């Protein structure tokens, strides 16, 4: 699909669900990716993969994670899964390679530095697929919260705390902030769709 690789402005959006936030102890249990163009139009959704872990690993999670992942259905999907970290990484890289060259896209999402740390340890090939830069929507959210609270309060996530719903929320959230970015918002901020 060489024609699909032409756009260097394409963006890879990613989200991980983990057993917790400790990058030395916890583990990735779900991954999802979406590729957009520079105007945040979705070009393709990658595989949404629950990663196999034993019941003991899930039971060792803190209460918030146990409750959240049971409620979202991820708990059972992880127990039913036969996908390993290596398989999830390979499937995700294979998908991305159809849409964008390695090293062309920053890692995009919310609190993406945390995801990058987990990827570095558990899916290093995938982590290296991204440019070293990050497009972290959380940064814009934190600035808006401080400088323009009404803008920050104007967006409500609909997420079910699954990887794919969180990726979609991140894209929607950046679309929301883009309309308030003045000259940085480009044609979209001026009401012109690209």
UniProtKB/Swiss-Prot annotation:
The gene is orn. SUPFAM superfamilies: Ribonuclease H-like (SSF53098). Residues 11-174 form the Exonuclease domain. GO terms for cellular component: cytoplasm. GO terms for biological process: DNA metabolic process. The active site is at 132. Belongs to the oligoribonuclease family. It comes from the Bacteria. This is Oligoribonuclease. It comes from Xanthomonas euvesicatoria pv. vesicatoria (strain 85-10).
């Amino acid at each position: 699909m060489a024609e699909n690789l032409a756009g260097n402005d394409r963006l890879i959006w990613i989200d991980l669900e983990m057993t917790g936030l400790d990058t030395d102890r916890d583990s990735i249990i779900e991954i999802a990716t979406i590729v957009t163009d520079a105007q945040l139009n979705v070009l393709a959704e990658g595989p949404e993969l629950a990663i196999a872990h034993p019941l003991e690993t899930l039971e060792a999670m803190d209460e918030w994670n146990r409750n959240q992942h049971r409620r979202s259905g991820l708990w059972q999907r992880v127990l039913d899964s036969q996908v390993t970290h290596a398989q999830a990484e390979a499937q995700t890289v294979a998908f991305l390679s159809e849409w964008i060259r390695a090293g062309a896209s920053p890692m995009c999402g919310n609190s993406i530095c945390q995801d990058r740390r987990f990827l570095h340890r558990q899916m290093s090939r995938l982590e290296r697929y991204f440019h070293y830069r990050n497009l972290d929507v959380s940064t814009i959210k934190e600035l808006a919260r401080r400088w323009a609270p009404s803008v920050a309060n104007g967006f409500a996530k609909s997420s079910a705390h699954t990887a794919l719903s969180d990726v979609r929320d991140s894209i929607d959230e950046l679309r929301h902030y883009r309309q308030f970015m003045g000259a940085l918002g480009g044609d979209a901020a001026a009401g012109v769709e690209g």
